[in-house]
Each structure stands twice: as C-alpha cells, then as structure tokens.
C-alpha cells in the first residue's frame, strides 16, 4: 500500500525524515509523559500509593504499552520509565522527563533514518543486552544532568504548605495581596 511505502523510503530521503522527526517527536514524547507520568503516576499517588511505587507501576505500564518486545528492549523501556518518573519527583514537574524523552526519541528515530527509514524504528521488537546497556547509560546521564541542573537552579520540587493553605482558605473578600 502507499502508506506502507512511505515507511520504506531509503536513506537518500533522510532530510524528509529528519524534518518529520524534529516536528513530531516533541509532541509524541510530551504526550506520553503527560499520560504516564503526569496522569497515571499522579493517579496512583493520589490513591495512597507510595510515590516510588507509583513510579515503578507507571514505568511498567509504560514499557508494556510499547508492544511486542524481547527482554532487553523491555528492560530498556522500563528503565527509561523509572528514570522519567524519578525526574518528576526529584525536579517537581514533567519538564525534565519530557526533555529526556524528546532527546531519546530524536536520537533513536534520527539514527534509524540512516539505517533505512522509519520502518527500522517502527518495527523494533528486540535489542541486545549491549544496546540496552548503552541506552540505559545514556538515560542515566541525561537524568543526572537534568537533576543537577534543577538543583543548581534551585527549582522548587513542591508547593510550600503555607501557600497551599492560603489558596484553600482564600475567599472573594480577601485582601488583594493574597498569593493565589
């Protein structure tokens, strides 16, 4: 079919794929992070689960949601989910996880362009232990860098309790200097 032919283009069309990857990867990565870490992980946490249990469960669901895969590819995706979830807790937001996911996808899909087109990335169902180890090392480096930057910038990882209480107690006839 014409649709499947699009995915079989040769590396001579690399620039077309590169543009498509640059335009779509950030949206796709952000959507996955919002779903798995922003929604699913927070739902688990709000049900009383320990936040680290929520990280593990959301990482498991994230890895399983990526379809058929061998043990090493599953471990690769599960580890990425663990690190992205840890970034949410350690940095106080989804931004670092989204950035890490975007970088991962840009490298993975960008590399696949030079190996034969998008069909290489779309059809990935297995990887060897060495490739998984290489990926996990890269994930860890990105996660540590993001965490270090958030610490260096003194990013608040949670809302101060007094601000939360002020917002909860705020009424329409409160003073104009209310922080909410």
What residues fall within each predicted segment?
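Transmembrane helix-loop-helix hairpins at the membrane interface
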Residues: 17-166
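Membrane-interfacial helix-loop-helix connectors in multipass membrane proteins
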Residues: 5-12, 119-121, 125
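Conserved small/polar residues in nucleotide/adenosyl-binding loops
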Residues: 2-10, 170-175
